[in-house]
Amino acid sequence: MGKFYQFIIEQREKHMEERDERDAPEVAACSFIDRQAVGGKSAPTESPPRLQLPMPALQLLRLDHAPALLAFERENRAYFAASVPDRGDEFFAEFDTRYAQLLAWQAAGTDYLHLLVAEGGEVVGRVNLTEVADGSAELGYRIAQKAAGQGLATAAVCKVREFAATEYRLSRLRARVTQDNPASRKVLEHNGFVAGGSLTLNGKLAMSYICELR
């Protein structure tokens, strides 16, 4: 998937350069193009000539995603634990029960849980909207270690932000990031999130972010 990630980097740099030249605050256009639209609806598509491998599909969580998601969490457990609290052995022991609860929350409309699914069905990332209420939701994401640092997070968050406004009819997204995670802060800032007040998150100094969609 190296060519895909190189394409993401090139597209992000291109959009950042164009934005700087315009000296305008607009958020760069999404460079992530999903192959399977959320809810079965059509989504904007592009066919960049340099792209020779399929991009990961942005998909809403389904029952049949369970094995791939479990593998994703297991393979990246130590990597994730370096920046966020470890889920603990209990999470994996009770995965089936917890997974069913996630699907129930999504069916109830309180959560929109997205996976980045590569060719072959491998999960390489998650971008979730949780605590959906009154036109607002909390955004959170995690990307596989082998896919980190390549611009995939920025592109995926951009696409979910679009879905939040158009598919889910939300007007505001919230996010929280610890001060020792500058990469995540950059992802949010590239996607139009504005820093708010400081807070404590899992015992660490953190910052709240807001993105107005309307």
Regions found by a protein language model. Give the residues of each.
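Generic, well-ordered alpha-helical segments
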Residues: L61, F72, E90-T97, A108
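Acyl-donor (CoA/ACP) binding surface of acyl/acetyltransferases
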Residues: M1-A68, F72-Y79, L113-R214
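A short helix-loop-beta-strand connector motif used in the catalytic cores of GNAT acetyltransferases and
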Residues: E90, Q101-L115
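Conserved GNAT-fold acetyl-CoA-binding loop/helix
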Residues: Y79-Q101
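Short alpha-helix boundary/capping motifs
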Residues: T97-Q101, A108, E167, G192-F193
